[in-house]
Amino acid sequence: MPRLLPALWLAVAALVLSGCGGYATTSDTFRRSLTQGKPDSALVAVNKAMEVPRAEDLPKSKTDTPLLLLERATILQAMGRHDLSSRDFEAADKQLEVLDFTSDTAGDLGKYLYSDDAQVYRAPPYEKLLVNTLNEVNYLVRGDLSGAKVEARRYLVNREYFANKEADERGLVALGSYLAGFAFEVDGDAQAAMRHYGDAYEEGGVPGLEGVVQRLAARTGAQDERLKPLLEALPTLPDDDAQQGELLVVVQVGMAPYRKPERLPIGAAVVYASQPGPGARLTPDQQNQANIFAAKGLLKWVNYPRLVRANRFDPPPTTLELNDAIPVAVPEALNVEVRVEEAFKRIEGGLIAAAVVRLITRAIAGEVTQAAARKASGSGGVGLLLGLIAEGTLTALDTPDTRSWVTLPARFDVYRARVPAGTHRVRVRTAGVTREATAQVAPGGWAVVNISDVR
C-alpha cells in the first residue's frame, strides 16, 4: 500500500495542473489583435481556433462553432470582406441558441457536471439581434438591397420574439430598425420604411431620425401613427431633391466588455446567489449544503465568469469630414458596452448559483469516493487521496463559461446626409486614427460606408 501513495499524489498534482483557461484564453489573441487595429492577425488567430486554414473554410461542428463564426464574421467585416462576413453571420444565426435564464433552476444550470462551457453556446438576446444588425450593414455596403431586406425581416422576427418573451432590449433594437427603414426607403417602399422608422422611434430613436422621416413624408406622403409628433411640420424640399442621393456612414468603435475567470470566496458566492433576483437562485437546501461543506473546509472558492471592460477609457467621439468640409461630430446610435453590462447583470446571480451547485456536486463526489476507498483499503490516507482525485478531476475540468461575442464593438456611430450626385470622399477620425473611403452616389441613388477596423 505505501508504494501506491506516491502514484496517487502524482495523480492529484497532474489534475491540479491540467485545467484549461476556457474561451477567455482561446479568444485572447484575436480580441487583442482587433483591439490593436490588426484584423489580419485576428483572422489568423480565429481560424486557428476554428481549426481551419482559410477564411473560406467552414469549421466542423463543435460546441463553440456558432460563437467563433460570429467572431470571424466581425473580423471579416472589419477587413472589408463583406461577402464572407455575411456567410459566416448567416451560418452562425442558423445554429445560435438563445440563453433563457428565466425558466432555469440552479440545478438545471449545474447539470453539466464538469463545466459550464461543456454545453453548446447559447447567446444572450442582444447578441442574436446584433447578428442581423451587423449583417444588414454587410448587405448595404455591397449595394445588395434584396439581401438587406431579407436580413431586416429576420431581424423583425427576432425582435418580435424577444418582445413576446418580455426581454428588456429596448434601445438596443432601434439601430436595427433604422437600418431596415433605410433599406426599404432607398428601394422605393416608403410606407414599409416609415413602419421601420416608427419602430426605431418607439424603441428610443436614433440621432437624425426626425429629419429623415420628415424628408421622407414630404417626398412621398408616407405616414406612421407613432411618428405624428415628428411630422407636424414638414420641410420644403429643394428643387433638385430628385437629383440628390443618400449617404449613410456606419462606424464601429472600441470593443465590447468580455468575460474572464474570477475566484469568489464561497461565503460571498452563497450570499450573492441566494438573493432575490432574475434567473436561477440557490434553494435553501443548496445553501445549507454549501455552508456545511464550507465549514468542513471542503469548499473555499467558486470559479465564475466576471465581466470586464475591454477599454480602460470611453472611446473618444467620432468626427467625419465630407469632401474637405469642416469636420462634424458623428452621433452615437447604439452603446453596446452599456447594453452588455445591463444584460450580464441580469444573469450574474444565476451564473454564480450554477457554479456553487457544481461545487457541491464535486464535494459530494469527493466524500463518497473517500469513504468507499477507506472501507475497501482500510487506509485513511488512500481514501483521502482518492477523494481528492475524484473532486480534483471535476475541479480541474471545471472552467467558468467565459464565452461571449468578444469582437463586438463598444459603440455604433451613424452619420447620414442628403448629398449631390457624384463621388464623395469620406474621412473618419476616431480613437486617434483616420480612415478614408470614397462613395459614388448616382442621381436619386445611395451609398453606405462602413468603418469598423478601428477598435
Regions found by a protein language model. Give the residues of each.
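Bacterial Sec signal peptide processing site at the extreme N-terminus
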Residues: 14-41, 50-53
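C-terminal soluble interaction/assembly domains
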Residues: 367, 371-455
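Boundary/linker segments of alpha-helical solenoid repeat arrays
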Residues: 54-62, 96-107, 161-169, 201-230
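TPR/TPR-like (Sel1-like) alpha-helical repeat modules
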Residues: 86-97, 153-157, 185-208
